[in-house]
Amino acid sequence: MQERIAKVLACAILGPIVMLSAVRPARAQDPSTPYPNMAPLDQYLMTDVNSEISLARSAAPSSSSEGAEVMVLGRSGYTTAAQGRNGFLCLVERSWGAATHDRDFWNATVRSPVCFNPAAARTYVPVYLMKTRLVLAGRSKIEIVQAIEAALDKKDLPALEPGAMAYMTSKQQYLSDEAKQWHPHLMFFVPGDAAKSWGADLPGSPVMAANDPEEGLTIFLVWVGNWSDGSPAPPTAH
């Protein structure tokens, strides 16, 4: 998912954050992308289920992730590999969590562990799971965007609940070739283009925003000082 906000990442690691244009609509399409097409599916899969479970749980502190449901990616999509008891859901996003025009959309190296709280698990994750099924079915980028848009319009996908948020604090994350590990952060999901109402991206504001027209929401990011294992994150400022 962090790959979906690649423009946020690029701005953050290069200097002061400027107003971004995307969570999925991150960067403009780069015709020289090294990933013009989907790689063989095996390159996106993790061969050891336990390793994927562990990586998924590393997205959040164990106080939340140990009781979370965990989903892992297989040839037909994500399936539950560990039952949960606290309503949280952890998984490792792949590159197609990005905007369809993002240069890393087919980057098979991307591994983005995310732990969603109950509200996000119920109402945000279904969009990503649908997108995954479309990818694995061989749908084109245009078809993916159209299918998601139609499902949202027809309310085949749930409306985003208030309070939906997620942890991305895994030291093992690889978010894109540009951002790589980046920085531990929290994400908050809000319907529509809501950046101004949160005071995001203003001078001195700790809140970054990425508008996502493909899914009709804004993702707000707030850096935190430690990785999920408690170790300090590198000092960075925006």
Residue locations for each model-derived region?
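Bacterial N-terminal signal peptides
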Residues: A10-S21
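Primary mode marks residue(s) on the alpha4-beta5-alpha5 output face of response regulator receiver
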Residues: Q29-H238
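Sec/Tat signal peptide C-region and signal peptidase I cleavage site
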Residues: V23-A28
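N-terminal secretory signal peptides that target proteins for export/translocation
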Residues: M1-K7
